Amino acid sequence: MGITIENVSKSFGSFQAVKQVDLDIASGSLVALLGPSGSGKSTLLRLIAGLEMPDTGRILLTGKDATYQSVQERNIGFVFQHYALFKHMTVRQNIAFGLELRKVPRAKINARVAELLELVQLTGLGDRYPSQLSGGQRQRVALARALAVEPKVLLLDEPFGALDAKVRKELRAWLRRLHDDVHVTTVFVTHDQEEAMEVADQIVVMNKGQVEQVGTPAEIYDHPASPFVMSFIGPVNVLRSRVFQQSEGTAAHCDIFLRPRDIIIETRPNGNTVSARIHRIIHLGWEIQVELRLDDGQELMAHLSRERFDELHLEPQQQVFIKPREAKSFPLYYSI
């Protein structure tokens, strides 16, 4: 099922949570709504679900106006951050709950539950209670329950936010595989850039109730549409108030954005390098973070592979020379 959002706005009192959002979500895609707290991503998800009604605009499902349809009429599955499982029911009973409400024949319920237990890799755990499961297993039960009624759209509101880092990473890979198997249109909310980049086909970056950019993970990272997107998607250095001479001879102030991995460090001057001094070296395991201070006092962060770091023999307080491998500039900057 494709989703079309046309000029949708939603306010709560004087606070405008969603501002004139236009968005197309292709049928069968896996889309991340990504942004900081207060960006409007969860409100937009609830508008798609029918849990909130927009003040203005329309929401279309497969081309049909569903703006004021109920959740039941939309046939949407919704999974919250905190599982919301029935504690007094077994895993099997939790998954079957929606099917029983719809009075599906018992034989079909049993077959569907068995199919879903296998799909979410919980075969053999159907008779356990939620308290006997790990956090990751509980979230998989919640996903199975949402999928049981064969929804046309699956909505996930920060589904892994309450889990520890290792489990989150495992479930991200699992969710991607699950989506490839079931092909249901899926929209999930996250503030975790890595999670969005790893899982989604398309990322919708939101800020202050508006959509900043829509694109594939590669497009969002390599071609950010605004300073906000550049700053929010991964670590970035900002060199402020650099002056560039324009063709007509006037000057313009630009901020230069540099990814830490795009800073080249040399131990000797080489071409258009700039002098800097190493302030601190942090070993991250898979790479080395080098904190630098320019002669004018501005601070930068560079990431080096372990191999390159070992080649350079860098130490704190050492003078080095840096240059960008790639940089982006924007005429105006606003913070996240």
UniProtKB/Swiss-Prot annotation:
A GO term for molecular function: ATP hydrolysis activity
InterPro entries xref list: AAA+_ATPase, ABC_SmlMolc_Importer, ABC_transporter-like_ATP-bd, ABC_transporter-like_CS, Mo/tungstate-bd_C_term_dom, P-loop_NTPase, Sulph_transpt1, Transp-assoc_OB_typ1
GO cellular component, one term: ATP-binding cassette (ABC) transporter complex
Membrane topology according to the record: Peripheral membrane protein
Keyword vocabulary terms for this entry: ATP-binding, Cell inner membrane, Cell membrane, Membrane, Nucleotide-binding, Sulfate transport, Translocase, Transport
Disulfide bonds: none
Location relative to the cell: Cell inner membrane
Family per record: Belongs to the ABC transporter superfamily. Sulfate/tungstate importer (TC 3.A.1.6) family.
Subunit annotation: The complex is composed of two ATP-binding proteins (CysA), two transmembrane proteins (CysT and CysW) and a solute-binding protein (CysP).
Annotated protein name in UniProt: Sulfate/thiosulfate import ATP-binding protein CysA
Source organism of the structure: Thermosynechococcus vestitus (strain NIES-2133 / IAM M-273 / BP-1)
Gene: cysA
